[in-house]
Amino acid sequence: SFVFYLFTLITVVRAEEFILENEAEDIAPAVHGESGRECIGHRRSCKEDRNGCCRLYTCNCWYPTPGDQWCKCQLW
């Protein structure tokens, strides 16, 4: 029981470190769309985008398919 608890604790800590590393990468300069003011991001979160810039943008969503719901993000 104690060993299982320890394993779970280590797994959670590692997951948090992984998330923090990924968030740090998102802050890096991003590749913008043709207009220089757009990027593509997932509907669930502006941080889940294809090139790391949507967290700085406003998300406007459209739904091409039920399984692939993406947003166009524009800097206002």
UniProtKB/Swiss-Prot annotation:
Cleaved signal peptide residues: 1-15
Residues spanning the membrane: none
Cystine pairs: 39-54, 46-59, 53-73, 61-71
GO cellular component: extracellular region
Positions of the propeptide removed during maturation: 16-36
Tissues and organs where the protein is expressed, per its UniProt entry: Expressed by the venom gland.
Superkingdom: Eukaryota
Keywords: Disulfide bond, Knottin, Secreted, Signal
Record has Secreted as a keyword: yes
Localization of this protein: Secreted
Keyword Disulfide bond: yes
Family: Belongs to the neurotoxin 02 (plectoxin) family. 09 subfamily.
Domain notes: The presence of a 'disulfide through disulfide knot' structurally defines this protein as a knottin.
Protein name: U10-ctenitoxin-Pn1a
Source species of the chain: Phoneutria nigriventer
